């Protein structure tokens, strides 16, 4: 008869809002670091004697590396200690970012390599952080959790633009060097917070949702070593595992349609976010500081309330019908694209800002619902790979080309970003159509996830019952000849999280 190995019950904790804030701070630091370059781009162009296209390549290199690395990073996020991994990566990217401040002005290629390498950082923190949030918070709280995460991302974006725009012109135009050092100290602080954050067991929020519990399981033990049989064997296993994970993800209809929709929308959003300050400077005749300040204010004043409202709506409406997770983003993106297109019609700055503020608010309202919807549709053990695929689609097939394509179109019309935006913006409606197609599948896909959770909980209860029975037998008999039953005087070695 096959012998069953008993396992101790998991360690439990009540979940507060703190984990969602810590994960959000990682996006704040990342957004600040990215947009410091955007804020001081005029000084960087002057120092290295390059044009808008070269700056577009600088942005695209980061995005492209991010997209390429994010899928294997998502694969690893499903297998390693995510909170510790984020802490280590944030320390490294803070140091690498500062290296950009000492690059000689004759070596634009070196600056390009440094900025591109930072794409590795977000490629790790995004799928890992999103996976952690999905394991800390159940369906009814995920919208709020992802809204906090995204709000802090917009705060970082605004801070980066403001810092870059303010520091860049200092020291006779060499202030851009100092801007690269700004993120070191806050980066180290956030890394420490991630290191101290408990690692939740995978799928614990889903199990708590099914059992109507307010306690979450904390992963016991350390992650298994990544290279127990050598690096070559690890690479082979990772490639095979990625193929299986991607095949599983693409077999989920909700994920298929959502990934296409996200890539299309990501292209438009990145195009606007990268070059909007140039639109203010060239078409509305603002100074560099005013242009970066305007866009930073737009991101914060529109992004934060939009994201909070979107998260609240996502959590409220998902209780009525699961399809709300993809319907809400579709409607929000369509409204946003329409408002932005009207804002590009020649008119005074005041109406332009109001239209874009409402458009930004509508666009950001879609993010919590969309991320929560992907969490609902993807199995817990594949959420890292799922968010990796989400980033891969939005980055490689969408965002990476946006800065270069937009600047190239603008140059064809005499550096007219108004015309470039009017050409690009209608593409967003194609993305909304694909997101709407996901509506008919998300309820079935989410139901399959919870069905698997119920089966896993039944298996876990059997293991815990066996563990309790063995302890009782050991106590009654005063000893055991069964070597699989551990002495009560010895610590029980917990199983690693899988």
Give the positions of each predicted feature.
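C-terminal ends and interior cores of transmembrane alpha-helices
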Residues: 91-105, 333-347
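Cytoplasmic membrane-interface "Motif A"-like loop-to-helix N-cap segments
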Residues: 79-90, 315-332
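A membrane-interface helix-boundary motif in multi-pass transporters
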Residues: 169-184, 287, 324-327, 408-428
């Amino acid at each position: 008869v096959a012998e069953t190995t008993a396992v101790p019950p998991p360690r439990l904790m009540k979940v507060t809002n703190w984990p969602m804030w810590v994960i959000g701070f990682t996006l704040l630091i990342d957004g600040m670091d990215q947009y410091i370059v955007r804020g001081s781009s005029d000084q960087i162009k002057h120092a290295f004697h390059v044009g808008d296209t070269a700056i577009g390549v600088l942005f695209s290199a980061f995005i492209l590396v991010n997209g390429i690395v994010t899928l294997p990073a998502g694969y690893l996020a499903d297998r390693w200690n995510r909170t510790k991994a984020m802490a280590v990566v944030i320390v490294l990217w803070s140091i690498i970012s500062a290296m950009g401040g000492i690059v000689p002005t004759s070596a634009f290629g070196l600056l390009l390599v440094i900025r591109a390498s930072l794409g590795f950082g977000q490629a790790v923190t995004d799928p890992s952080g999103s996976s952690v949030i999905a394991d800390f918070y159940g369906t009814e709280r995920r919208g709020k959790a992802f809204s906090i995460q995204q709000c802090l991302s917009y705060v970082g974006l605004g801070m980066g633009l403001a810092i870059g725009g303010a520091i860049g012109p200092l020291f006779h135009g060499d202030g851009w060097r100092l801007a690269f050092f700004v993120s070191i100290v806050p980066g180290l602080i956030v890394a420490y917070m991630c290191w101290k954050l408990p690692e939740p067991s995978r799928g614990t929020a889903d199990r708590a949702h099914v059992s109507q519990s307010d306690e979450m399981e904390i992963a016991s033990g350390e992650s298994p070593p990544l290279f127990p049989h050598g690096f070559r064997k690890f690479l082979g296993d990772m490639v095979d595992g990625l193929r299986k994970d991607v095949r599983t993800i693409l077999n989920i209809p909700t994920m298929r349609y959502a990934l296409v929709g996200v890539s299309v929308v990501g292209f438009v959003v990145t195009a606007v976010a990268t070059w909007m300050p140039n639109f203010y400077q060239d078409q509305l005749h603002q100074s560099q500081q005013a242009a970066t300040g305007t866009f930073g204010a737009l991101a914060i004043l529109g992004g934060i309330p939009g994201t909070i409202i979107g998260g609240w709506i996502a959590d409220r409406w998902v209780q009525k019908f699961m399809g709300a997770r993809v319907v809400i983003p579709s409607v929000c993106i369509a409204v946003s694209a329409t408002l932005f297109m009207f804002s590009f019609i020649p008119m005074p700055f005041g109406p332009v800002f109001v239209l874009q503020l409402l458009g930004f608010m509508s666009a950001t309202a879609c993010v919590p619902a969309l991320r929560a919807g992907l969490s609902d549709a993807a199995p817990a053990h594949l959420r890292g790979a799922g968010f990796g695929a989400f980033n891969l689609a939005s980055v490689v097939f969408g965002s990476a080309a946006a800065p270069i394509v937009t600047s190239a179109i603008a140059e064809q019309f005499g550096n007219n970003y108004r015309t470039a935006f009017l050409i690009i913006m209608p593409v967003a409606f194609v993305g909304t159509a694909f997101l709407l197609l996901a509506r008919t599948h998300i309820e079935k896909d989410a139901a399959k996830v919870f069905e698997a959770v119920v089966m896993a909980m039944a298996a876990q209860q059997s293991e815990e019952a066996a563990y309790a029975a063995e302890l009782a037998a050991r106590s009654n008999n005063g000893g055991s000849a069964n070597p699989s039953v551990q002495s009560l005087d010895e610590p029980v070695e917990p199983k690693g999280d899988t």
